[in-house]
Amino acid sequence: MLYWLLYQKLHTYYRPLRLFSYLTFRTAFAGLTALAIALALGPWLIRRLKAFEVGQYIREDGPKSHHSKAGTPTMGGLLINIAIIVPTLLWADLSNPFIWIAMLSLVSFGAIGFVDDFAKLRRQRNLGLTSRQKLLAQSLAAGIIAIILVGLNYRGRYSTRLVVPFFKRFQPNLAFNSLIPHHGLYLIAFLPFILFVILVIVGSSNAVNLTDGLDGLAIGCTIIAAGALTALTYISGHAVFAAYLEIEHMPQVGELTIFGGAIVGASIGFLWYNAHPAEIFMGDVGSLALGGALGTVAVLIKQELLLPFVGGIFVIEAVSVMLQVGSYKLRRKRIFKMAPLHHHFEHLGWSESKIITRFWIVAGVCALFALTTLKLR
């Protein structure tokens, strides 16, 4: 809105307003606006959630150190989502379709998380939607995003090719080209692409959700991952940088830098209240939304295969759960003392603050590695 008003309408009358045409300027202000909103609304939301008794339920079989957290206000993801959406609407070019796709992902996955959190509160147990219900809703939301991208591909504004790290020329198409001319088979031709998009976005959403088990852990890793994705987005949308690094130049996705900056700013603001000992938890309304948004941005900028490195801790946490469940079903033995992995280290006697800090360090190293791969091609 501010971009439309201050640049598109008024910059011809006042030259300094041309600053609003620069992505870096608007990204910085989007991040600062998100930070200000999160910091300003945080205390109010904490008070309101306490008044409505929207408190976290703690499992009896969980680590004993967590029992003191019972009743801590949850659903703080509402604050994060608002702090992302408002700056994006203010500072982004709203004629850009990729901005709306990213916000659709944030809102739809946030809505799924809200329903899940609300169900947990009503039942006064740590059980919301069933795994099948949640997966179905997430797949539907991601599927809609994939179909929208198929439409953009038809208009020549998006590619269904898969960019493979370390390889410049190898970019397989995730669509059956031979079926595309047949209009009745158009969606079937893009079925591999649609399924891949669903896998990336749903997987990212659930991975962040699994990581959200310690004060500040998930949101700290989100800041790192979102920062790396924001850098990748800016590079993809910048003709000179894209040419230098020999990656696909996608002019319109550059606007997503503002969305990424808003995620970073909102997450930093939320971390102020979520740092150990946490005053508020994000809940599924936050973790599912953030994970879905990160996965969607990765899909939009064609860096899906870099996402496991960008969000390294999220992947490690998710894999630890899969290994634990698979091992128990096949061998009736557990690999870890408890999954996700951060609980395993708690049972080993590590302090919560030490686990969080070390996981942040690993997340930072993974994100840096992801950025270095741009030149290793």
Residue ranges and their predicted role:
Residues 111-118:
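Alpha-helical transmembrane segments within multi-pass membrane transporters and channels
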Residues 120-129, 166-172:
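Membrane interface segments of multi-pass transport proteins and intramembrane proteases
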Residues 2-45, 80-111, 145-169, 190-377:
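Alpha-helical transmembrane segments
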Residues 58-72, 126-138, 342, 347:
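Juxtamembrane helix-capping/reentrant segments at transmembrane boundaries
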Residues 61-69, 124, 178-186, 243-251, ...:
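Short juxtamembrane and helix-loop transition motifs at transmembrane-helix boundaries
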